[in-house]
Each structure stands twice: as structure tokens, then as C-alpha cells.
Amino acid sequence: MVTLMDKIVIKDLYLQYSDQTESLRGINLTIPANQISVLFGPAGGGKSTLLRVLNRLNDLTDVRAQSGEVLFDGLNILEKSVDVINLRRKVGMVFATPVALPFSIRRNVLYGLELAGEHRPRVLSEALERSLTQAALWDEVKDRLD
């Protein structure tokens, strides 16, 4: 039973990658609102996979099978009808090791701006160069942005 105090409720979550690796099996978990929660376990135990499920980053990977429910504020975020862009505005994450999305350098850098609705070429071009310059990467990658 989901209560108003439950922010995230995971029911019988299963995930298998295309290489047949079962990453998650029978996961049941309730994360209350306004609380700090911790996931810990051995390397390769599925912690990062579980976190990627919460904002549907696994949609960008080679998942063979996924089942169960993940309720975020009562909404099953695994349903195909869920607006993934809106979900990712609400559920963000920062991993210890940065993970680039499977896009070009340009698309990775500009992803947040485009997600927020910015599509003016000049604004995007300036933001791209400014961001990569501030990260001391412009000279290294300017010729291979796409």
C-alpha cells in the first residue's frame, strides 16, 4: 500500500540487459519523502542500475527485459506514456564517475539547454564554446563535436 509519505515505491522490479545479465531481480523498496536514503553493496550489485531506473536513463541502454512497477508520487514511471523529459526534470542524479549519454560531444554538452526548450542556434553555439572553454576542453574537442 502506498501512503502520502512514500515518495518512491518499487514493486517486484526486474531488469535484464541484452547480454543476458540479470542486474535487478525482485526488488521491493519504499523510499519515504523528505528522508535521506542510502543504497550500498558490492560493486556490480545493481545500485547504479537501480538509480538509472528512477529517471529512465536505462531507456538509453541495451535493456532486454524490464518488469515491475516504480511509483514516483503514485505514478508508475515505467509506463510508456510517462513524459520522460518531465520526469528527468524532477529526478536528477550525479554519479561518482561521470557518464556521458550516448550522443556526440555537442549533444551531451547542450542536452540540458535543449531539454529546457532552448533551440536558438546562436545561443546554443555560444553556450557550447563557453562551457567547453571553461572546462579547458575547447581546444581539445572543437574539431570533433559531432
Where are the language model's segments positioned?
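Conserved structural motif at the start of ABC-family nucleotide-binding domains
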Residues: 8-10, 24-26
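The feature captures the beta-strand-to-loop junction immediately N-terminal to the Walker
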Residues: 40-42
